[in-house]
Amino acid sequence: MPTDDIEKKVLVTGGAGDIGSRLVKALLKRGLKVKILDCQYGPFKEEKHPNLEFVGTGDSELHGGMANRDIVQKAVADVDVVYHLAINWDGHTWKHQLPLADLFDVNIRGTLNLLEAAKSQGVRHFLFASSCAVYGSQESKTVDEETVCKPELWEGDPGPAYGILKLTAEKLCLLYHHECGLPITVFRIEAVFTDSDALPSRKIIDNLRKDGIIEVTRGDGYASIHVDEVIHAFLLATLNKKAYGQIFNLSNPATFITYYELYKFLIQNTSSKSKVRLTVDQTSSGRAIESTKKIQRALGWKPFKTKDDLKKAIIQSLKSI
């Protein structure tokens, strides 16, 4: 396991979030000393683990630790590996309910602060959690890491600004790799689900509650990925020279579900009186399936969850609605 080569500490930005907190737990289980750069404690509020250290906790939601150069320098000190999962984002932002200028300032400046600190302090590996949202709307039904990204054309959740933000951060990471020699790995991650959290978008839930006719385009749907599959990829890539300077898709095509199948499944498992109708004359949503052949060849990573696992998680999620 590459993590056995870590001599110092590791830093997880966004370590109190859904994915970050699980990565932190996996790293602690391996006996590593972990720093968390986050504005909140999340599931670690009562945690007293001797190998766990918090930096930047308590900063405001908008101006969290990433944007503060001094806090970032402190966070990166004595660190071998940086896992950059933090992002300041709000689901409503793409409808311009929050100022995009502020969010781009915090996130891009924060990523630059981390990269600069990583370069100056001799970090051995910088891993960035990007998103498959960078692909935007595509004519092809399958995309790989060489596909031209068109995030500005995306019209669905989480909106074009999110993909543009992630793609910009990707380019900055790769710049520091090629110009400064900082080992970088970028993961483009699909929608992540857990055993108890796989809620569809609010739009889908709202449609169900209207108890009307729901029209969906034949064949349209989406793939996702279980959080354990994501954590496995991060651990496999850590300090692995085959991952340096690379972009990898993280998705599980086996979980692909059409919107028709999803709505039928949700109606069967809720009190919704909605009806689903297939249409063939509408334009496809443009959502493609991400190929994971590259990471499977390079690192030996393989997805291991199924569509049944996704459906079980959706049922668990429905209990919280």
What are these model-derived regions, one by one?
Residues 2, 9, 307-321:
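Amphipathic terminal alpha-helices
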Residues 10-30:
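N-terminal Rossmann NAD(P)H-binding glycine-rich loop of SDR-like oxidoreductase domains
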Residues 56-106:
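NAD(P)H-binding glycine-rich loop region in Rossmannoid oxidoreductase-like domains
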Residues 82, 96-127:
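NAD(P)-cofactor binding segment of oxidoreductase domains
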Residues 112-161:
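Conserved Rossmann-fold NAD(P)-dependent oxidoreductase catalytic core, especially the SDR/UDP-sugar
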Residues 139, 167, 179-182, 193-203, ...:
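Glycine/proline-rich active-site loop of Rossmann-fold NAD(P)-dependent oxidoreductases
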Residues 140, 174-222, 227:
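NAD(P)-dependent short-chain dehydrogenase/reductase
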Residues 233-282, 292:
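Mid/C-terminal beta-alpha module of Rossmann-like enzyme folds, strongest
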